[in-house]
Amino acid sequence: VIGTKPDFYKQAPLVVEAKREKLPVFVIDTGQHFDDILGFGIKEFKLEESVGCDLQIRGDLMEKASELILKFGSFGRFCKEEFGSTSKLLPVVHGDTLVAGIAPLAWVFGMGQKVAQNEAGLRSMSPEIMKKLKITQEPTLDLIEKYIQEQFDGKWFIAREEPFPEQIDTWICSAGTQYFFAPTQLNKDNLVKEGYPDEFVHV
């Protein structure tokens, strides 16, 4: 599944490798980045020849979100009617994008199955010292140096809300994911701590 510029670059290798392994693969393009500048990655990686479904999502963030759940869910329903609920179709979404947040939910509603996530387990972290800082506090040289040092020596905590909406998207995506493809061991550790089965999380 591709929708925005980051998707083109992160998902293109999956399409290339699937073809090399002679696995059946096609691209679902949400169409969010469709102009020549933002959409150049589709042409650059020759993804257009693999697009089997173009959802043509447009509008502002709320309009895109609403349209995405309706169209992606409807496509899932169509696939269920055509291929059955035990079909091996497996959408692979990417990272912490809007598509990653909404497509799994829509696919569960439409197809009755979960998805796979590329770049799974992305979680923002902040140093513990952030909790002690006050917005009204005047930044002194000592405070700045302490803040910098704490980033190296201090403990860190998972920040669920920032950046917004990316962190919401990736948390929601995890709940609708069956197979997790994590970029690092830290990302896998995040997912396992959250209760996702170790055997379904691959680094």
Task: Give the ranges of each region predicted by the language model.
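Glycosyltransferase specificity loop/lid
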Residues: 1-86
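Alpha-helix capping/helix-boundary segments
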Residues: 33, 99, 186-188
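Hydrophobic/aromatic ligand-binding patch that stacks against planar heteroaromatic rings
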Residues: 17, 103-108, 172-173
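Helix N-cap/beta->alpha junction signal
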Residues: 4, 97, 184-186
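Structural motif
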Residues: 1, 28, 88-90, 93-95, 118
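Active-site-proximal region of nucleotide-activated glycan assembly enzymes
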Residues: 112-203
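An aromatic- and histidine-rich active-site surface loop
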Residues: 92-110
